[in-house]
Amino acid sequence: MTFKGFSKKDFQTMQIPGLEARMAGIQNDIQPKFKAVGEELTTYLSAKLGDEMFLHIARHQRRSVNPPESTWLAICHDKRGYKKHPHFQVGLFDNYLFIWLAFIYENEESAKIANRFLKEKKLLAELPDTFAISPDHTEEKTFPVHDGHLETTLERFRDVKKGEFLVGKIYLPDDSHLSPGKDFIKEAEMVLDKLIPLYKAALQ
């Protein structure tokens, strides 16, 4: 499909009641966009990193009762899975779109990565004020990257077994960067460029 951008309808899909109905909306309306966006960004990251990257689209197969509050694509160097590795995400809650560099609770090197970021503060200090962080990919709550929550979020990521750290940028449903498609791709590439130094540091 030709990607024309994300619309308010995509956010409304994440409000559809019921597991079956919401999953139908995600599969029919959002995942084709994820495939189109993800293929472009996977190619972009592969070239930028000099390493083959692979696209994964969340299937939410473990859900049997409650519909997913968010849905996403992930881009990772591992073809078999992304959750235990540093990876990039583009996804939606019902009230914002996110572009993250994500370290979720399955990551096996959380302490090492958190300590590196805590020690090398310049890596995160150079991020734009428009960027945000999240301590939990399942929750909508985010914080501006420079508002004082960064250190405690990294410490929680290091010290708590299911701690997480996500950093990137969020967009409200009426943000002009979400469409047309070429504008969103350009914006996403800009965000990824800012996150690549962190990604490389996490892999060291």
UniProtKB/Swiss-Prot annotation:
Xref: InterPro entries: UPF0637, UPF0637_domain_sf
Protein name: UPF0637 protein lwe1043
Domain of life: Bacteria
Gene3D superfamilies xrefs: Protein of unknown function DUF1054
Family the UniProt entry places it in: Belongs to the UPF0637 family.
Cystine bridges: none
